[in-house]
């Protein structure tokens, strides 16, 4: 209602939600998962949608970016962070690693100091703590590199262990498919992608990105339809970075903080934060890792998978899983059986455009950081130092 939210019981919340699901055509239901969502949640949501709702409208991206998930090598950091020190040449494409991946950036700095390696960037991204050469940020320049018509092409070919890093800003471009696939082809043809060394890397910004792609939570039509208000019922699982103007759709927010997703929701189901539940995540390099909880969820908040399980029970009379271990077993089984498949065939046209690197609000990068007093203080100090010119 316009005057805020009304407190209801879990039973009423499930009742409201299941009534809404039953009265909505599955084609008109969509879901976007969040940037801190663990893999148990991602998998249970996928199973709920695919098996119970008979619906495939799932995505994990708040904006459309180019992803070819026919092979993991298209969306992970293939070179591995520990191998950066073996590199003798780096090309940054639409990324500011100092803000997007600080540990990775410190490795690049260490490698520069140790090997005096050359670093190039398509765009001036400010102080990275090491010198780098700036190439024009137009996609034309990258096209020339890919076609072996640029000095950087020669440097990549002559380098023993080159590294090319695509940031998320580059993958948002209209011609990102052309540029990414073109670079992959160029590196392959010059034997820079082989059993010992893979020079092609993608730098994902969020903890849940790689795991979501591994679980195929990716659908260009879904994100288009959410952003253009085509769905009647939208689930946001910890998703607070969507830039949409709400119209008539019914929005269900399952999350932890009263942030952007909750503000436009019609129904809020409180869940545990990532610090309040054990959960699997797949990191930048594609390794599965288990994060242990540091505390318990407040009040009546539940773990996300429990909410999904309960919704399934209310709809079909039976739960998806008898316990969390069964869910984890099913999840690991899915990952083990996953084979290479054909990615969505996207027409990869070249378009001349500027490669901008998105400015990251460093201390406010996610919903939990945005609600932290400490992070707010750090951010304010940074803003003050920028205004006074005392920022290094």
Write out the residue ranges for each language-model feature.
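Catalytic alpha/large subunits of respiratory electron-transfer oxidoreductases
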Residues: 1-277, 311-319, 339-392
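Short coil/turn motifs at helix boundaries and re-entrant loops, enriched in small/polar
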Residues: 116, 203-206, 283, 301, ...
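Short, charged, low-complexity patches
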Residues: 300-304, 308
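Residue-level signal for alpha-helical context at structural boundaries
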Residues: 67, 126, 286, 326-330
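Internal, active-site/partner-interface "lid" segment
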Residues: 305-306, 317-338
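Glycine/threonine-rich phosphate-binding loop and adjacent beta-strand/alpha-helix elements that clamp
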Residues: 276-297, 312
